[in-house]
A protein has these predicted regions:
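Accessory terminal helices/loops
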Residues: 1-4, 160-174, 178-264
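Conserved beta-strand hairpin/beta-sheet module of binuclear metal-dependent hydrolase folds
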Residues: 3-57, 127-136, 143, 270
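Active-site HxH/HxHxD metal-binding segment of metal-dependent hydrolases
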Residues: 19-20, 41-117, 318
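Core dinuclear metal-dependent hydrolase active-site scaffold
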Residues: 25, 105-130, 168, 246
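Divalent metal-coordination and catalytic microenvironments
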Residues: 26, 38, 65, 77, ...
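Short hydrophobic beta-strand that contains or immediately precedes a catalytic carboxylate
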Residues: 36-37, 264-269, 285
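Active-site neighborhood of phospho(di)ester-bond hydrolases with catalytic His/Asp-centered motifs
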Residues: 36-39, 58-67, 85-90, 118-120, ...
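Catalytic cysteine-centered active loop of the rhodanese-like fold, especially the PTP/DSP P-loop
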Residues: 116, 285-327
Length: 327
């Protein structure tokens, strides 16, 4: 537990109903530094809205493991906010900014998030602890645990991760899992030790391995799509990139002179930035609002995305590409 006053610790649990995935957003209200755990691609707009409305300086976008049932938005949040994409040390993810070893800590404001290596569901699962809360990803679930039949899963490793590491925390420690499909939101260590049918405190390794090896679960519906994308921080390199050429003012004027009525410059900055100066004739659609204007954008033969550094334009480009736009 951090010795600082917990009154400035702000915590939000978000949910994606289509995949049963929990996302966790937390920050220090004194400094506004924060982080997000297991963000979901389809909820990118919602996550960004919370971050912007609350004024959070997002330092880290964290994934507990390479997910098989949904696509992460950690790379998109990095592009949008400057946060560092973060995975466990054993992860083979390409492009991660930070790889955490067991015991590493991430600071946000007055608080620290501790990484706990908990392999078993996959070989690179990482749980996290801060302020009396454990974020267990798919390792320990409420009255259950993650499966161990793909991505180098290993029931013996999972048993040891839960019983030797997670169950070593005080009984009152709150447990926030990566998923739940029955409407439950949290548990605590003593509850899982007492009532978890797969891995209660009296469970033996042999019995646990037998249970896990005989689950015979169907493979996740999106596994063939999700794993390849999540190995790239959720960003599909096949979607390409916006043009990274540097434009001079002369280039910009030439572009504007050649624009036809069916072409448009879209400024994806915030309205206050747009008001301080913008490309003449450009349309202001702040990043995160592009879905509301998707039909209007489809109406143009060609659009040019503009922002201050190109990072937000990159993110909007990705979102529009995912919606099937090629203009």
């Amino acid at each position: 537990m951090n010795n600082n006053d917990e009154s400035s610790f702000v915590f939000r649990q978000l949910f994606d109903k289509d995949t049963g995935t929990f996302t966790y957003l937390m920050f220090d209200s004194d400094t506004l530094e924060g982080l997000i755990i297991d963000p979901v691609k389809e909820q990118f707009d919602r996550s960004l809205q919370f971050i912007e409305e609350l004024g959070i300086e997002l330092k880290y976008a964290i994934d507990t493991h390479v997910h098989a049932d949904h696509i992460t938005s950690s790379r998109m949040l990095r592009d949008a906010t400057g946060a560092k994409s973060t995975f466990g040390e054993n992860s083979s993810v390409q492009g991660a900014d930070i790889r955490l070893n067991d015991g590493d800590e991430l600071e946000f404001g007055h608080f620290k998030l501790k990484a706990i290596s908990t392999p078993g569901h996959t070989d690179a699962c990482t749980s996290f602890y801060t302020e009396g809360r454990l974020f267990t990803g798919d390792s320990l679930l409420i009255r259950g645990c993650g499966r161990t039949d793909f991505q180098q899963g290993d029931p013996e490793k999972l048993f040891n991760s839960i019983t030797q590491k997670l169950y070593a925390y005080p009984d009152s420690t709150l447990v926030y899992p990566g998923h739940d499909y029955l409407g439950r939101t949290a548990s605590c260590i003593i509850e899982e030790k007492s009532f978890n049918p797969r891995i209660h405190s009296g469970q033996t390794l042999e019995k646990f391995v037998q249970i896990m090896n005989n689950l015979n679960l169907p493979k996740p519906k999106r596994i063939d799509e999700a794993i390849p994308l999540n190995l790239k921080c959720g960003f599909s390199l096949e979607l390409g990139h916006v043009n990274e050429d540097n434009f001079t003012m002369h280039d910009l004027h030439q572009l504007l002179d050649k624009l036809t009525p069916t072409e448009r410059v879209i400024d994806v900055r915030k309205p206050n930035e747009y008001d301080q100066g913008h490309v003449p004739g450009s349309l202001n659609i702040p990043m995160g609002n592009e879905r509301e204007f998707i039909d209007e954008i489809r109406g143009y033969d060609r659009v040019f995305l503009h922002c201050h550094s190109g990072r937000r334009a990159q993110t909007v480009y990705t979102m529009l590409s995912m919606q099937g736009l090629e203009n």
